[in-house]
Amino acid sequence: VGFKAGVKDYKLTYYTPDYETKDTDILAAFRVTPQPGVPPEEAGAAVAAESSTGTWTTVWTDGLTSLDRYKGRCYHIEPVAGEENQFIAYVAYPLDLFEEGSVTNMFTSIVGNVFGFKALRALRLEDLRIPPAYSKTFQGPPHGIQVERDKLNKYGRPLLGCTIKPKLGLSAKNYGRAVYECLRGGLDFTKDDENVNSQPFMRWRDRFLFCAEAIYKAQAETGEIKGHYLNATAGTCEEMMKRAVFARELGVPIVMHDYLTGGFTANTSLAQYCRDNGLLLHIHRAMHAVIDRQKNHGMHFRVLAKALRMSGGDHIHAGTVVGKLEGEREITLGFVDLLRDDFIEKDRSRGIYFTQDWVSLPGVIPVASGGIHVWHMPALTEIFGDDSVLQFGGGTLGHPWGNAPGAVANRVALEACVQARNEGRDLAREGNEIIREASKWSPELAAACEVWKEIKFEFPAMDTL
């Protein structure tokens, strides 16, 4: 008798409000803005269809498979408070739609063609629930927070970093000199800027050699383990791996990758190499704002953060919170928890749409970087806690006396904040006072405080939540 050809509404097949989600389903929360005249159920069902088994018309080959087994389902829709004609559509995807251990495949399905769909004005993926049945197919971060602390032999405080500036234009030897001065002054890490790859003024191999020399000299003089994030990002995966192999041969502790511009396939390969060879992996999120900055369209950074934890990285940049609005603080801390913790409860006030259970997947250390300086240290220590990397680029290299004193100032400020916290003092209220006290016995810190004192230090008490 053939089959019933023709176009039918998506909602007849893909909108299933009675569906009970399974523990193995991947769940997605989409912010959907339908075109005028498109009902929300149809829009939500269209998203479920286009990101799973559907196409625009009924096809004969539908009869050769079980759609009920493989289709995505829009199982709940709620209006967004304060927005006209905008909805959160919840979609459940059967686990078998996805290749094991492939973030690339997961994103190709969930945020693929559907984002160009005409029936929608805009579409944003707000959150994903990754079931243990899927996350267990990933290696995840090469080492994780605890193993990193053991490798570095550094406990009970945040780690300190610095991005070498000017980011482009230095020769390899001068670059290595800046690395040495910062590490010698008291930082734990220095960092290649995300766009330092292998340019005519400084080829990657020369940079790696001079930076390794700087690391070993600083280690010998301070008795502390030091690292420099050697950026292995390259134009091909083969070239990227070549750089990572060379870093391992030099014996340095950590390499770096730009995971969005480099791509998830390259990143996952590099993360697996890093675990097999004892390298830590620092991840920069260049290009994230292209994807996550628009409120109505794209993908929230918390989804990119979850994807990175699956693909693999030991550190990832996660914003600074300082000086931003209170609401953003809560949302940032939400995805910081998604990066670090094993089990994260659903909490809509922090932007967490689903309870996420990572089981035993190692955690990722969030990196606070961008426009921060010594006066921010109490706030950063309070907000991010010990398992974080605080990165001061200009806040180190901009010190009036030079790089090493800039590093000293940051280290003194950090140690003062950690000590004050451990003594039970309230960093939120006494932050400025703690920094002032410390600067009395550190001329380097006093000079840094003087330079950046104009920059406002507003840190409202945390108990106003």
Curated annotation (Swiss-Prot):
Residues reported to bind substrate: N113, T163, K167, R285, H317, S369
Sequence positions that bind Mg(2+): K191, D193, E194
Biological process annotations from GO: photorespiration; reductive pentose-phosphate cycle
Protein name, per record: Ribulose bisphosphate carboxylase large chain
PANTHER family assigned to the protein according to its UniProt record, in alphabetical order: RIBULOSE BISPHOSPHATE CARBOXYLASE, RIBULOSE BISPHOSPHATE CARBOXYLASE LARGE CHAIN
SUPFAM superfamilies: RuBisCo, C-terminal domain (SSF51649), RuBisCO, large subunit, small (N-terminal) domain (SSF54966)
First-listed, main subcellular location of the protein, grouped into a coarse class: plastid
Localization annotation: Plastid, Chloroplast
Organism: Byrsonima crassifolia (Cajuil cimarron)
